[in-house]
From Swiss-Prot:
Glycans are attached at residues 41, 68, 237, 249. It comes from the Eukaryota. Disruption phenotype: Worms display a lack of uptake of GFP from the pseudocoelom into coelomocytes, suggesting a decrease or absence of endocytosis in coelomocytes. Mutants also display a slightly dumpy appearance with a low penetrance defect in distal tip cell leader function, indicating defects in coelomocyte function. It comes from Caenorhabditis elegans. Thought to regulate endocytosis in coelomocytes through modulation of phospholipase C activity. Possible acetylcholine receptor. Belongs to the ligand-gated ion channel (TC 1.A.9) family. Acetylcholine receptor (TC 1.A.9.1) subfamily. This is Acetylcholine receptor-like protein cup-4. The keyword Lipid metabolism does not apply.
Length: 433
């Protein structure tokens, strides 16, 4: 009797429960109703297409991707610069590269289990919401639409269950106006900045530098990855900073209250610092100036005035050639004349005055004109000349009227020594300071 009761208990209670457990394990794609073959034979593109249909169903790219509109959208930005071109005549700088932008979207969400565990989706730029950014100092104007590429791809990554990370990496080619100062040519140091801003106030969109990382520079590959010299300039540093525009002013202090957020726009400034690269300046400019200055001084120690006059004319012609070659490379936009140009100008004036002086002495000696009484006082210097040099400037004491030749023998060496000292001082001031 007990055996019959035990068998009936098993038939009534245990077997239905076991059958129900087996049926529950066979539900899904492995069950009789599931289509496992169709699920596993789907290609990756088919899963992506189904995923895009799901996440973009009812999605509006014009709406900011925040379910709570009182919270702003934080956009992280990083610059990857691959080339910098500086036009010193137009006072412009053109920067090429990629700009990385990242933010979180609370509407582009999905369950990866429903799409073969896909965590990433690659879509087009126009399909998702994106911050509207402009360059305030663009040479093309504030409303230019050609600073950033419009064909960039977007990567969406699921982050948890309630939001997705959106990454965009468009290329850019930005030309901005600058205010260069080449007064210290060829040792001039200049800076130029690109000012990026969002058209929405900080109550909606806030731009910030990604982890405060400075812009990445890639001017070359492999052995040229440390390249920093482009054309006539050497890039010294590229930095980024956060700025804020409010009430017509730009400040580095972030707004505090919510009211201030509604009247403030976030800006990101990328500043490029560069110095002129002119390795041939000493050989092409300084050395000729030293040679010309030496020859000018030497003319005061040549006895023949006619030879001196011809040499001075040759100096003047050579200086014009050097000046033409220098001015051809000199930037037109300068606030003050560079010291090297001042030095060449001083040399030309010195050459001209020396030419006039020697011409006057030559004319006086040729026509044998008497020396003016005022110039006779110069012969007092003879008493202070060392005995070593007196033979060259010896003048007969019994002569009451001195000749121009006597005057030349006295003052030309003195002027030569004084000129050498002055030229050395000018070279020190103009080229070394």
């Amino acid at each position: 009797m007990k055996i019959i009761i035990f068998v009936c208990f098993i038939l009534i209670f245990y077997l239905p429960i076991q059958k129900k457990h087996v049926n529950s394990q066979q539900q899904g794609i492995d069950s009789d109703d599931g289509d496992a073959e169709s699920f596993f034979n789907k290609s990756y593109s088919e899963h992506q297409s189904a995923l895009e249909q799901k996440i973009f169903r009812g999605y509006n790219p014009k709406n900011r991707p925040m379910k709570n509109a009182s919270f702003p959208t934080i956009v992280d930005v990083h610059w990857h610069i691959i080339h910098v071109s500086i036009n010193q005549r137009e006072q412009t700088m053109t920067v090429h590269g990629h700009i990385y932008m990242r933010w979180f979207d609370e509407f582009l969400v999905w369950d990866p289990k429903d799409f073969n565990n896909i965590q990433y989706a690659r879509v087009k730029k126009w399909q998702v919401w994106q911050p509207k950014i402009k360059v305030s100092n663009s040479a093309s104007g504030l409303g230019s639409a050609f600073d950033f590429s419009t064909s960039a791809h977007v990567i969406i990554q699921m982050m948890g269950k309630d939001r997705a990370k959106v990454e965009m990496y468009p290329t850019f080619s930005i030309k901005v106006g600058c205010a260069f100062d080449f007064t210290d040519y060829p040792y001039d140091l200049n800076k130029c900045a690109i000012n990026l801003f969002s058209t929405s106030t900080m109550a909606d969109v806030q731009l910030q530098n990604l982890y405060a990382i400075p812009p990445t520079l890639s001017f070359g590959w492999e052995e040229q990855k440390m390249k920093r010299i482009i054309s006539d300039f050497k890039i010294q540093n590229v930095s980024s900073s956060a700025l804020y525009y409010t009430n017509g002013n730009i400040t580095s202090s972030a707004p505090i209250t919510g009211f201030d957020l509604g009247s403030t726009w976030s800006m990101l400034a990328v500043t490029v610092s560069f110095v002129r690269h002119s390795p041939l300046f000493e050989a092409a400019v300084v050395t000729p100036c030293i040679v010309v200055a030496s020859l000018i001084s030497m003319t005061f120690f040549i006895d023949s005035l006619s030879s001196t006059f011809l040499l001075m004319m040759l100096h003047f012609y050579v200086q014009l050639i050097f000046l033409h070659d220098l001015v051809e490379k000199l930037p037109l936009s300068v606030s003050e004349i560079p010291f090297c140009i001042k030095l060449i100008g001083i040399l030309m004036y010195t050459n001209g005055l020396t030419l006039v002086l020697h011409s006057s002495l030559l004319c006086g000696s040729y026509y044998k004109c008497p020396v003016p009484q005022q110039l006779n006082k110069i012969f007092v210097i003879e008493e202070y000349i060392p005995n070593t040099f007196k033979e060259k400037v010896q003048i007969k004491k019994e002569e009451s009227n001195k000749s121009w030749r006597d005057l030349m023998k006295l003052i030309r060496p003195i002027i030569g020594f004084v000129l050498i000292i002055l030229l050395i001082c000018m070279f020190f001031v103009c080229l070394l300071l």
